[in-house]
Amino acid sequence: RIDMMEKHPMGSQAFIPMKETTFLAFVAPKGDKPEIEKIQSFIIPPGIGINYKVGIWHFPLISTEDMNFLVVDRKGSGDNLVIEDLNKYELILDFKPAV
């Protein structure tokens, strides 16, 4: 259930998996609030890391098994986390395999 999204307005955020497993990423474009109709989901194959650009809305990563990630995040002053509650929506995302 995608019940919230977060963004980091002051820095990008990278996730490098510490073992070979598949995980899911859910993202929405930059903006004041996530645009529900523009949320996209991606299946990230084993051995691949991801980097969210500054301001990209995303849901915490979902792994197909227990997983640890090396996280590269911004350090410094200022609030670099914005959370938007999505509980008022019922989100159903279709899976369409890449061609």
List PLM regions with ranges.
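Conserved metal-binding segment of the jelly-roll/cupin
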Residues: 43-57
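Ligand-binding loop in jelly-roll beta-barrel domains
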Residues: 54-70
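Non-catalytic, conserved peripheral segments adjacent to functional cores
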Residues: 1-41, 73-87, 91-99
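Solvent-exposed, flexible loop/coil residues
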Residues: 46, 61, 65, 87-90
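Residue-level detector of short, conserved catalytic/binding motifs and their immediate flanks
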Residues: 13, 50, 67
